[in-house]
C-alpha cells in the first residue's frame, strides 16, 4: 500500500475479471464471450475505417451509432447513451442516479461489479437475498429508497425475470431509477426496452460484447427517457467526452444492422446451450434454468472446485466463485458445439475418476 494513495484507493476492493489465458489451445468457457466471430460486415467496416480519418477525434456524441440503435429499438436518438462497454455505462449510471444518503438495492448473487461501484462512490446498499432456486423476490425491491439494479437474465445464474415482474418493481419505485442490466438478454429473454415509454424511471443497459461478438471493442449503451440520458451525458462529459473511438463506432453500427447474422449466431448458442444442459443432466448435474449464453451447474456427489481444477488441468476454463451459497456451482459459458463436445468429454472423464 502506497503512502500516495487516497483513502478511497486504500479502501476499495477492485473487481476481479475472469482469467484471460495466453495459451490459445485452452477452451475458454469462463467469460461468456461469443464463440462465433463478428459479422463479416463488421470486419469489413473495421478494414475500411483504418484510414487517414483516424488522426481526427471521433464524434463525442456518437450520433450515427445512437441513431442506429434508436432505429433498432424504435426510440429517438435522445433516448440512447453510448459508453465504453456496459461496465462504464453502469459505473456512470451509479454516479448519475444514486445518492450516498440513500440505500440502493441489488441481489446478493449478481454481477460482482455492483458493490465495487457502490463502494467507490460511497453509496449505501442492501443485498436482496435470492430464493433457494435463485429467483428474485420482487418484494425485496419494494420502495428501494435509493434505487434498484436488476440483472436480467441474472449473472452468474442465468435466471430470467419476467416483464410483469420488472413492471411491478418499476411501479414500486416510481420516484427512483431502476436499472435493468440486460447484458445477456438476446439469448432467450424479452427486453424491458418496450417499457421505456411508460416508465420514466427505467434505464436499460446493454452491451455488444455478448450477442454481437464485440467484447474486444468495448461498446455498451443505455436506453431510457430523455431526462435520464441527459443526466448520463452530464456525467460522461465530466469524465471523458470521447468514450467510443471511430473504428468501434463503425463496427457497432454494422453489428446492429446485420440482423440475419445476429439471429443465426444467437440461435446456434441457444441450441448448443440446450444440448449441453441435456447432456449434463444425463450424468447427474443439476442446471439452473438459463436464458443466457452460460449455464450454472452443480452436482450432489462432486465438489465444484475439484471439477474446476481438473478441467483447468485439461485446458478447459470455466468460472468458479468461492462465495456463500454458490461455492458448489460452476458457471459454464456456451462455446461452439465442437467446444462443448470436448467439454462434455472432459467432464465425464473427470467425474469418473473423482
Curated annotation (Swiss-Prot):
InterPro entries: Aminotrans_II_pyridoxalP_BS, Aminotransferase_I/II_large, HisP_aminotrans, HistidinolP_aminotransfase, PyrdxlP-dep_Trfase, PyrdxlP-dep_Trfase_major, PyrdxlP-dep_Trfase_small. One of its GO terms (molecular function) is pyridoxal phosphate binding. Belongs to the class-II pyridoxal-phosphate-dependent aminotransferase family. Histidinol-phosphate aminotransferase subfamily. PANTHER family: HISTIDINOL-PHOSPHATE AMINOTRANSFERASE (PTHR43643:SF3), HISTIDINOL-PHOSPHATE AMINOTRANSFERASE 2 (PTHR43643). Keywords: Amino-acid biosynthesis, Aminotransferase, Histidine biosynthesis, Pyridoxal phosphate, Transferase. Its EC number is 2.6.1.9. Pathway: Amino-acid biosynthesis; L-histidine biosynthesis; L-histidine from 5-phospho-alpha-D-ribose 1-diphosphate: step 7/9. The modification N6-(pyridoxal phosphate)lysine is found at residue 210. It catalyses: L-histidinol phosphate + 2-oxoglutarate = 3-(imidazol-4-yl)-2-oxopropyl phosphate + L-glutamate. Homodimer. This is Histidinol-phosphate aminotransferase. The gene is hisC. Its cofactor is pyridoxal 5'-phosphate. It comes from the Bacteria. It is an enzyme of class 2 (transferase). One of its GO terms (biological process) is L-histidine biosynthetic process.
Amino acid at each position: 500500500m502506497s503512502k500516495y494513495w487516497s483513502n478511497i484507493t486504500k479502501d476499495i476492493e477492485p473487481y476481479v475479471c475472469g482469467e484471460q489465458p495466453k495459451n490459445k489451445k485452452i477452451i475458454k468457457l469462463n467469460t461468456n464471450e461469443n464463440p462465433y466471430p463478428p459479422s463479416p460486415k463488421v470486419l469489413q467496416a473495421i478494414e475500411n475505417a483504418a484510414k487517414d480519418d483516424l488522426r481526427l477525434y471521433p464524434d463525442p456524441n456518437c450520433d450515427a451509432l445512437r441513431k442506429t440503435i434508436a432505429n433498432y429499438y424504435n426510440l429517438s436518438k435522445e433516448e440512447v447513451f453510448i459508453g465504453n462497454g456496459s461496465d462504464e455505462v453502469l459505473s456512470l449510471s451509479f454516479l448519475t442516479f444514486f445518492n450516498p444518503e440513500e440505500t440502493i438495492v441489488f441481489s446478493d448473487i449478481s454481477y460482482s461489479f455492483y458493490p465495487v461501484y457502490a463502494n467507490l462512490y460511497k453509496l449505501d446498499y442492501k443485498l436482496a437475498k435470492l430464493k433457494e432456486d435463485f429467483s428474485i423476490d420482487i418484494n425485496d425491491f419494494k420502495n428501494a429508497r435509493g434505487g434498484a439494479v436488476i440483472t436480467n437474465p441474472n449473472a452468474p445464474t442465468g435466471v430470467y425475470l419476467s416483464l410483469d415482474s420488472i413492471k411491478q418493481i418499476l411501479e414500486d419505485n416510481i420516484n427512483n431509477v431502476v436499472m435493468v442490466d440486460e447484458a445477456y438478454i438476446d439469448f432467450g429473454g424479452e427486453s424491458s426496452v418496450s417499457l421505456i415509454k411508460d416508465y420514466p424511471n427505467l434505464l436499460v443497459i446493454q452491451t455488444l460484447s455478448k450477442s454481437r461478438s464485440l467484447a474486444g471493442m468495448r461498446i455498451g449503451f443505455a436506453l431510457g427517457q430523455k431526462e435520464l440520458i441527459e443526466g448520463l451525458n452530464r456525467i460522461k462529459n465530466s469524465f471523458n467526452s470521447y468514450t467510443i473511438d471511430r473504428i468501434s463506432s463503425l463496427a457497432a453500427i454494422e453489428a446492429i444492422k446485420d440482423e440475419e447474422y445476429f439471429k443465426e449466431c444467437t440461435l446456434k448458442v441457444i441450441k448448443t446451450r440446450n444440448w449441453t444442459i441435456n447432456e449434463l443432466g444425463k450424468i447427474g448435474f443439476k442446471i439452473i434454468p438459463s436464458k443466457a449464453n452460460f449455464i450454472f451447474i452443480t452436482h450432489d456427489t462432486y465438489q465444484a472446485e475439484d471439477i474446476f481444477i481438473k478441467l483447468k488441468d485439461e485446458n478447459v476454463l470455466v468460472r468458479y466463485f468461492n462465495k456463500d451459497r454458490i461455492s458448489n456451482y460452476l458457471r459454464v459459458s456456451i462455446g461452439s458445439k465442437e467446444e462443448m463436445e470436448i467439454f462434455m468429454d472432459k467432464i465425464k472423464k473427470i467425474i469418473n475418476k473423482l
